Amino acid sequence: MLNYKLILLFSSFLQLISFSGFMICCLTSPIIRNWGLAQAAGVSYGTFGYCKTLNSFSCSRVRLIYNTSKEILPGPSLERWWLSPKARHTIGGLLISIPVATCLTFISFALPLVIIFLFQTGGTNVSLITSNAILHILTLLSTIFACTVILLLCMHRDPVTISSLYDLVWLANCSLFPLLVIGVHFLSFRFDTSAQSDRKHS
């Protein structure tokens, strides 16, 4: 029982780290003006909009979906993006996956804590563990998709304007920790089934 609780607490902790990373992504420009998923030619791109720092400081409205290719960067900088403006506009509509992944990681963080209180000693807990594992698989898929969207949309060929190492580390955390959580829940399933088997043979 103690091992099972520790596994759930560790799982919740990993999801908390992943949730923190996505929360930082959601707070980028224009919510926090100087924070962005990518900066190029005086434009800071965020999840819900952008801010321009060149000449005069101005920000777009907070929108769930916005056109990331609307701001035409001066000079040849438009050609230095990995993707064309049309492709960036299409992928920009998928930025909604970031708040979706944020919500899923928060639920995945809170659910193991709830399961600890619902756990019945001597009872069958396979359904609780299975439902939690399914949720974490969905969370993993959403985090991988959201991180892929961010990388495709924000990566720039100019090394100076590529997302900072700090942002890339957070993206790695967001996609890695849910994968670790699935392994942790596999262990919890083994603990629960082995405990039930021992009770049947005793």
Curated annotation (Swiss-Prot):
PANTHER family: PROTEIN DCV1-RELATED. It comes from Saccharomyces cerevisiae (strain ATCC 204508 / S288c). Disulfide bonds: none annotated. It is found in: Membrane. One of its GO terms (cellular component) is cell division site. Its main location: membrane. It holds the Pfam family SUR7. InterPro entries: pH-response_reg_palI/RIM9 (IPR051380), SUR7/Rim9-like_fungi (IPR009571). Disruption phenotype: Leads to lethality in absence of CDC28. This is Protein DCV1. It is a multi-pass membrane protein. Keywords: Membrane, Signal, Transmembrane, Transmembrane helix.
